[in-house]
């Protein structure tokens, strides 16, 4: 049973992030980030996600050197493909906390990217404390032949383990950063009550994946919720 279905208010639909929190960095940083990622790939190039080899269709791969070729429709998202691990900071109803996270971005040659993010809370000494947020979904590009302006619009469809599904829309900001905002959100009867969100992802100096997320609070305003910097582990 769906208990809530609503869009983010129109005046919240443009992401405005302070310069100091912008993962995309200054002009030209995208080229440097891609070059740094290529250097780091020498250490991670031999790793990939495990797969079974007895299915009659292409296997998922998080390594662009292995498996099916990435669809041409996804070239603007190519830097995201891989396995990413690191730490971040969150803000919940019980205050601020630190978390560890792994994000797996893979594909099978289709016109979408698979997305899985798992996190765990850390204690004061940086050790595992408890399970955290988890989400899975798909990145796609909008295809509307009647509206050419939508050719670079991104769809991100997510299902959250906390009991809600979320549809984001956004666009690439640069060749290595992407900006998205919640367009619709549906909560199950047992799901947590949350507001819509804005996310900014970017490949930053050193080839890391960084992001910030703001969510709408009970008063209708955007407040900081999550931020993290993750290093490439595979791909």
Swiss-Prot record:
Enzyme Commission designation: 5.99.-.-
Major enzyme class: isomerase
Presence of keyword Transmembrane: no
Membrane-crossing residue ranges in chain numbering: none
Family under the similarity heading: Belongs to the nitrobindin family.
Domain remarks in the Swiss-Prot or TrEMBL record: Forms a 10-stranded antiparallel beta-barrel structure able to accommodate a hydrophobic ligand in its interior. In fact, this fold hosts the heme group, which is located in a wide surface cleft.
Name of this chain's protein: Peroxynitrite isomerase 2
């Amino acid at each position: 049973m769906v208990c809530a279905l609503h869009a983010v208010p129109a005046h919240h639909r443009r992401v405005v992030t302070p310069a100091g929190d912008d993962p995309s960095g200054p002009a030209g940083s995208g080229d440097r980030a891609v070059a740094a990622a290529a250097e780091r790939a020498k250490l991670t190039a031999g790793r990939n996600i495990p797969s079974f080899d007895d299915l009659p269709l292409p296997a998922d791969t998080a390594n662009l050197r292995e498996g099916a070729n990435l669809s041409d429709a996804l070239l603007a998202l190519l830097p995201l493909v891989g396995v990413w691990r690191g730490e971040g900071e969150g803000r919940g109803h019980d205050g601020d906390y630190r978390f560890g996270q792994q994000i797996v971005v893979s594909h099978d040659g289709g016109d979408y990217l698979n997305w899985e993010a798992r996190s765990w809370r850390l204690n004061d000494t940086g050790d595992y404390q408890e399970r955290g947020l988890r989400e899975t979904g798909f990145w796609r590009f909008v295809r509307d032949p009647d509206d050419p302006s939508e050719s670079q619009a991104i769809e991100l469809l997510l299902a959250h383990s906390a009991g809600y599904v979320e549809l984001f829309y956004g666009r690439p900001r640069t060749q290595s950063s992407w900006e998205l905002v919640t367009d619709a959100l549906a909560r199950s009867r047992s799901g947590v009550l949350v507001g819509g969100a804005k996310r900014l992802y970017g490949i930053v100096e050193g080839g890391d994946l960084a992001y910030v997320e703001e969510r709408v609070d009970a008063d209708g305003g955007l407040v900081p919720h999550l931020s993290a910097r993750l290093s490439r582990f595979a791909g």
